[in-house]
């Protein structure tokens, strides 16, 4: 913010000084009647007093040479004419003959030592030569001679002010202040003295005193633009942006082209825009940013903040325009480059995103957010080594950068190192206990190694849910009619209504719901829609349902939307995976709330009533605990709709290869060391057999080598293993099953989409039951298809089943060619019957609600009772004991971060591809609005 400091100039500050530099106090004579003396064209006719009067008139009209000649003519006849000496001195002074002028004034003073006019003009000459002290002494003599002589007082105030400024600039602020006050004592209406006092007090950070002085300066001189400008600076620095803007408006009203004030106005308006935007009025924020550009059209910060605002409004094309403008006008704005990268990354233009992040790092090599974001892109691309390097650099640049540790955890998770992933998530939570992404990623990661031997994973989910629920206010009443048989409004919320694993299991209900009795409302949080999104939307709307796009909308606002839609049963399909809306579910906007499909465990949220499953994935005898009440469907809890891009089933490759190929397309996190041990036993027992594994991280050589090294240590030669990286096109991915004879499921976290895809492409899958839901998903799928014989009860049986399948290539080939039809005729692909079963389940839930049987309300009441009981047991002198940790977990902020656009470290999260069933949440850091 720019201050204006203007050292006053004598000739410009005193109203008693004429335009020609001489004192107005030296008046030309008039006749006895007070009429002006008429000018005669004939000079020689004037003598004595008349000649002096005529000379004064000429001088007033800037005819100094002619006037000087007359004064000298008079002085030749009367050397003691004081008025002529003064007039002569003024004429010489105006012709830049200062020494001769001074001699003339000195002669006048010699004749009349008390002549205030001559003394004052000597002071002016001293000041012109920079001899301020002598000038002041001369003015003081003039005032002593004539205390009422106003020109001397005004000139003295000017020179004292100049002396004060010189002292201030020399570092003697207190002495400078004293001189300013002396100037005010001499002339209490001298505005520049008040103004310069304001400048000094501002520099001394005595802002109340400074404001008072600026206000007095403005009172004495209402057109004092600099005073209004500096008042605005003080108000702006105090955070009183409205008052600052009012001051700048007054400044510009008197001086419309005052560039400093225009720039300051742009800064204040930009800050006000950021303020109102953070308060929730983003449209007004945009208006202020645009107004800032009216005052300073090349102000990069306003352009940058417009980019942030448009990004938050999901108007990404506009955001790109203003980020590029910001960078154009400020080539050092690394934040603009970073936020451009965030947008391009979310648009899947990864090469452009990398280019933007690298540009940001060229400007700021240790810019932790761009280092982190580059690591995010490399992680998505499967470039694990490069990703690790970038994220580690981000942590070195900013050791307290919590989000970077979260992303390091994602990296370890993708590389299959679950223990290191959990450690990284926990490190993130140590730095930022409120990190929603790290908290949920940690829960997801624990599923990969949980065999159900204890309740630690349940307790982790439960504790997370209790803490998370406290961040939201729960609704406890609804206007929904408690008619058990009326049409129900069913809401589904998910970010995965696109070509994603979950989409293959939600399609059947969308297609087969009885919309007359079950009105469907879809809440789509899809980041980037694709053809499948559009197909789903068209299908729902055509059947009379409702489709609402909620990406980027605050979860509390989504809760309000759900209540306005009068949803009776709300089903979330994501759990703790990417872009979930558990914050919305924590508000409990619907009378009945359900979790289904997207996560293989409890959400931990007390506000969710039910978890939909089946008796194969979660047998009635299960010891696995859930916060929600389990509701079991008659067949599988899943219904698979195959991809139309799958293509035909190919012949068994063993027929032409002469050997059997085992394989898995599950993500690497599921392929634990124990899984590899079992697979190695199978491969070693089947001569010449091969293993094909496909997953994204195999694009990185170090990950490939680590994987092969583990298998080699287990006795399997690397030459027998084919590692395939991510295949982008869904058709190509499905056709890759033509390389595989037998699919090997993972444990204790079984495949879901990969198992269905394998069966649909004719590849039988060997799975193994366990004691937790995640372990038993394959059991549910295979039994539902009619392949109970491929379900093992333990590792030895798993190995035996795989060896047995491989031993009879003919039977294997026959099974392959019949599997698709077997699957299509099974309940797993019977969308109509599945949806009827689902609707019956919903109706039962609703009837229970109408009867007052609400699991979540009972659960929450029990929690409150437990807390109250514990509180009553506390000894008064001791600190209160709470069964719930006080560590708060905050909701992620949507939309990008200037503290460091899209917001403070917004959690822009990564969705898994169709071949990976659980998305993890990456923190992609944007930069929020700048304050100047």
Swiss-Prot record:
Induction: Not up-regulated by GA3 or ABA application. It comes from the Eukaryota. One of its GO terms (cellular component) is nucleus. GO terms for biological process: gibberellic acid mediated signaling pathway; protein glycosylation. Expressed in stems, leaves and flowers. Expressed during all stages of corolla maturation. Residues 436-932 are annotated as: Catalytic region. The TPR repeats mediate protein-protein interactions. Expression of such repeats in plants generate a dominant-negative mutant. This is Probable UDP-N-acetylglucosamine--peptide N-acetylglucosaminyltransferase SPINDLY. It comes from Petunia hybrida. The gene is SPY.
């Amino acid at each position: 913010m720019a201050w204006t400091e203007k050292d006053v100039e004598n000739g410009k500050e005193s109203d008693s000084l004429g335009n020609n530099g001489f004192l107005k106090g030296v008046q030309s004579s008039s006749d006895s009647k007070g009429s002006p003396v008429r000018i005669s064209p004939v000079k020689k006719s004037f003598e004595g007093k008349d000649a002096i009067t005529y000379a004064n008139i000429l001088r007033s009209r800037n005819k100094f040479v002619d006037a000087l000649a007359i004064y000298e003519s008079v002085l030749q006849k009367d050397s003691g004419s004081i008025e002529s000496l003064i007039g002569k001195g003024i004429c010489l002074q105006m012709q830049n003959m200062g020494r001769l002028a001074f001699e003339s004034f000195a002669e006048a003073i010699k004749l009349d030592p008390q002549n205030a006019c001559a003394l004052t003009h000597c002071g002016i000459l001293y000041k012109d030569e920079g001899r301020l002290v002598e000038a002041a002494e001369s003015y003081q003599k003039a005032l002593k001679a004539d205390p009422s002589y106003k020109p001397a007082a005004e000139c003295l105030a000017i020179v004292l002010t100049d002396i004060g400024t010189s002292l201030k600039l020399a570092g003697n602020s207190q002495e400078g202040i004293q001189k300013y006050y002396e100037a005010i004592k001499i002339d209490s209406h001298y505005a520049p003295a008040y103004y310069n006092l304001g400048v000094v007090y501002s520099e001394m950070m005595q802002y109340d005193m400074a404001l008072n002085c600026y206000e007095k300066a403005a009172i004495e001189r209402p057109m004092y633009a600099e005073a209004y400008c500096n008042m605005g600076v003080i108000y702006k620095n105090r955070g009183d942006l409205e008052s600052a803007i009012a001051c700048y408006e007054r400044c510009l009203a008197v001086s419309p082209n005052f560039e400093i004030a225009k720039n300051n106005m742009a800064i204040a308006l930009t800050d006000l825009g950021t303020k109102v935007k953070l308060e929730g009025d983003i449209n007004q924020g945009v208006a202020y940013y645009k107004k800032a550009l009216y005052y300073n059209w090349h102000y990069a910060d306003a352009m940058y903040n417009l980019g942030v605002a448009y990004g938050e409004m999901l108007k990404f094309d506009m955001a790109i325009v203003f980020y590029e403008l910001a960078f154009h006008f400020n080539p050092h704005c690394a934040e603009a480059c970073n936020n451009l990268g965030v947008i391009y990354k979310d648009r899947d233009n990864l090469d452009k995103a990398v280019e933007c992040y690298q540009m940001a790092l060229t400007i700021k090599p240790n810019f932790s957010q761009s280092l982190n974001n580059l690591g995010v892109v490399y992680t998505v691309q499967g470039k694990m080594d490069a990703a690790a390097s970038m994220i580690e650099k981000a942590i070195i640049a900013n050791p307290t950068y919590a989000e970077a540790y979260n992303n390091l955890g994602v990296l370890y998770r993708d590389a299959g190192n679950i223990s290191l992933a959990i450690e990284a998530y926990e490190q993130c939570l140590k730095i930022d206990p409120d990190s929603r992404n790290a908290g949920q990623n940690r829960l997801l990661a624990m599923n990969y190694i949980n065999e159900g031997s204890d309740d630690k994973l349940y307790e982790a989910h439960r504790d997370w849910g209790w803490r998370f629920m406290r961040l939201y206010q729960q609704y406890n009443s609804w206007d929904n009619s408690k008619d058990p048989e009326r049409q129900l409004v069913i809401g589904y919320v998910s970010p995965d209504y696109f070509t994603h694993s979950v989409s293959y299991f939600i399609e059947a209900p969308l297609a087969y719901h009885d919309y007359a009795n079950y009105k469907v409302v879809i809440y789509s949080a899809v980041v980037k829609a694709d053809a499948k999104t559009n197909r789903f939307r068209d299908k729902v709307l055509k059947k009379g349902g409702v489709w609402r796009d909620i990406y980027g909308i605050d979860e509390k606002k989504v809760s309000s939307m759900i209540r306005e839609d009068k949803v009776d049963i709300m089903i979330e399909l994501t759990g703790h995976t990417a872009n979930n809306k558990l914050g919305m579910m924590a508000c409990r906007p619907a009378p009945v709330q359900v979790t289904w499909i997207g996560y293989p465990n409890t959400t931990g949220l007390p506000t969710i009533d039910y978890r939909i499953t089946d008796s194969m994935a979660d047998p009635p005898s299960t010891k696995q605990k859930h916060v929600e009440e389990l509701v079991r469907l008659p067949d599988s809890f899943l219904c698979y709709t195959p991809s139309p891009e799958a293509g035909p089933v190919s012949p068994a490759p063993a027929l032409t290869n002469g050997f059997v190929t085992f394989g898995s397309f599950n993500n690497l996190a599921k392929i634990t060391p124990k899984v590899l041990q079992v697979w190695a036993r199978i491969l070693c027992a089947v001569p010449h057999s091969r293993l094909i594994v496909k997953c994204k991280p195999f694009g990185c050589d170090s990950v490939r080598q680590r994987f092969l090294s583990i298998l080699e240590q287990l006795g399997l030669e690397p030459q027998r293993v084919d590692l395939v990286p991510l295949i982008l096109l869904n058709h190509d991915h499905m056709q890759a099953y033509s390389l595989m004879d037998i699919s090997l499921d993972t444990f204790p976290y079984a495949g879901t989409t990969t198992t269905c895809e394998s069966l649909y492409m004719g590849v039988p899958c060997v799975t193994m039951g366990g004691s937790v839901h995640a372990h038993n998903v394959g059991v549910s799928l295979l039994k539902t298809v009619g392949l109970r014989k491929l379900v093992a009860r333990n590792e030895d049986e798993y190995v035996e089943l795989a060896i047995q399948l491989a031993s009879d290539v003919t039977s294997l080939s026959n099974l392959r060619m019949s599997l698709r039809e077997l699957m299509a005729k099974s309940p797993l692909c019977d969308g109509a019957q599945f949806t009827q079963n689902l609707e019956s389940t919903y109706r039962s839930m609703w009837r229970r609600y109408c009867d007052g049987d609400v699991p979540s309300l009972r659960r929450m009441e029990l929690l409150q009772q437990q807390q109250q009981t514990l509180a009553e047991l506390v000894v008064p002198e001791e600190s209160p004991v709470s069964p719930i940790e006080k560590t708060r977990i905050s909701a992620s902020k949507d939309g990008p971060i200037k503290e460091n656009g899209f917001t403070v470290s917004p959690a822009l999260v990564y969705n898994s591809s169709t071949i990976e069933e659980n998305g993890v949440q990456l923190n992609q850091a944007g930069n929020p609005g700048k304050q100047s």
